């Protein structure tokens, strides 16, 4: 095909991303340093935040306080929460995609406090990313089991003070009953279905992670049915005063450990919102640590079909 064809072939292969490994991002198998392996031999920091201010009352958050928080938007409207794992990967709940599983229907908003940015908020729209792939755990069964999914973004995220990845670990044992765990989201704010009021800012709540024995005991009152498996855990207040609600699904539950933040759970399901003896139920990320790492390590960018057609034409050209 000649020197010119060979050059075009090399450029097309680079543009299509053929053979390029998926970015591993902010993963680790256990306690360690604050830097994690990233794509292309680079190292990336995770679990850091530069904004520490907290709005009085601990209900409404501040921009940049949770820089890994993502708003998953279905046809431009907030639908679920998520968390940034690396420049190309976002973690969320599988049940968010039960009826809407085409990547083209979704975008991911990062770095914004509000779930409804105004049309003239150019900063917000510059930090909105298209979704290339939605990878639901193959064993997902609604919201009850294996409620976890990964989104591969169509382009790389630019990090700044308001956009940073979260760390994850292969064990959550050390986080049970720790005082500094938080859940964030843009969901309803009362059991009666009160929506988030303007300016639709992210809300945060400090929660305690319960062990599964205690959680099953609470769910067995007044019935005698255990509902919490090892792939889940409960968090919140036993009196129902702190809980997640509709619209928070897929969002992160994170804990501080030695100055680094780790995502421990994904908002999954609950019995209504804010009910006594019915704490919120979360996907236990540690159970899926190796699945997450495998998907992120082995996925490759999807080539542009037009580029592949041109590539074939070059290969067959005299």
From Swiss-Prot:
Q: Identify the EC number(s).
A: 3.4.21.-
Q: Where is the Peptidase S1 domain?
A: 55-297
The record's keywords, sorted A to Z, are: Cell membrane, Disulfide bond, Glycoprotein, GPI-anchor, Hydrolase, Lipoprotein, Membrane, Protease, Serine protease, Signal
Lipidation, GPI-anchor amidated serine type: 299
Q: Provide GO CC annotations from the record.
A: extracellular region; intracellular organelle; plasma membrane; side of membrane
Show the active-site residues. 95 (charge relay system), 147 (charge relay system), 249 (charge relay system)
Q: What is its main location?
A: membrane
What positions does the record give for glycosylation?
211, 284
Q: Where in the cell is it found?
A: Cell membrane
Query: What is the top EC class of this enzyme, as a single word?
Result: hydrolase
Biological processes, Gene Ontology terms = proteolysis
All disulfide bonds of the chain are 80-96, 181-255, 215-234, 245-273
SMART domains tied to this protein: Tryp_SPc (SM00020)
Q: Which residues form the propeptide?
A: 20-54, 300-318
Q: Tell me what PTMs the record reports for this protein.
A: N-glycosylated.
Fetch the PROSITE patterns from UniProt. TRYPSIN_DOM, TRYPSIN_HIS, TRYPSIN_SER
**What is stated as this protein's family in its record?**
Belongs to the peptidase S1 family.
Q: What's the protein name? A: Serine protease 41
């Amino acid at each position: 095909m000649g020197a010119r064809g060979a050059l075009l072939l090399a450029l097309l292969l680079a543009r299509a991303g053929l053979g390029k490994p998926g970015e591993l991002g902010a993963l680790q198998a256990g306690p360690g340093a604050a830097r994690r392996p990233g794509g292309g031999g680079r190292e990336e920091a995770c679990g850091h935040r530069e904004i520490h201010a907290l709005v009085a009352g601990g209900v409404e958050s501040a921009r940049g306080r949770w820089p890994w928080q993502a708003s998953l938007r279905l046809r431009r409207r907030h639908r679920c929460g998520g968390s940034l794992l690396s420049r190309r990967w976002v973690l969320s709940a599988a049940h968010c995609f039960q009826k809407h599983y085409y990547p083209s229907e979704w975008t991911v908003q990062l770095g914004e406090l509000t779930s409804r940015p105004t049309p003239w908020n150019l900063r917000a729209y510059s930090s909105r990313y298209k979704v290339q792939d939605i990878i639901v755990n193959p064993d997902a069964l609604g919201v009850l089991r294996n409620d976890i999914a990964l989104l591969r973004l169509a382009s790389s995220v630019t990090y700044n003070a308001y956009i940073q990845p979260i760390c994850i670990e292969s064990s959550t044992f050390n986080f049970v009953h720790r005082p500094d765990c938080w859940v964030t989201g843009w969901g309803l704010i009362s059991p009666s279905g009160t929506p988030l009021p303007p300016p639709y800012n992210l809300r945060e709540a400090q929660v305690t992670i319960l062990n599964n024995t205690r959680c099953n005991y609470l769910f067995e009152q007044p019935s005698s049915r255990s509902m919490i498996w090892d792939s889940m855990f409960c968090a919140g207040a036993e009196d129902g005063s702190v809980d997640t609600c509709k619209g928070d699904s897929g969002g992160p539950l994170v804990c501080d450990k030695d100055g680094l933040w780790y995502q421990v759970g994904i908002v999954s399901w609950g019995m209504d919102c804010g009910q006594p003896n019915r704490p919120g139920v979360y996907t236990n990320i540690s159970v899926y640590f190796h699945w997450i790492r495998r998907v992120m390590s082995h996925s490759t960018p999807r080539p542009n079909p037009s580029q592949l057609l041109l590539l074939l034409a070059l290969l067959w050209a005299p």
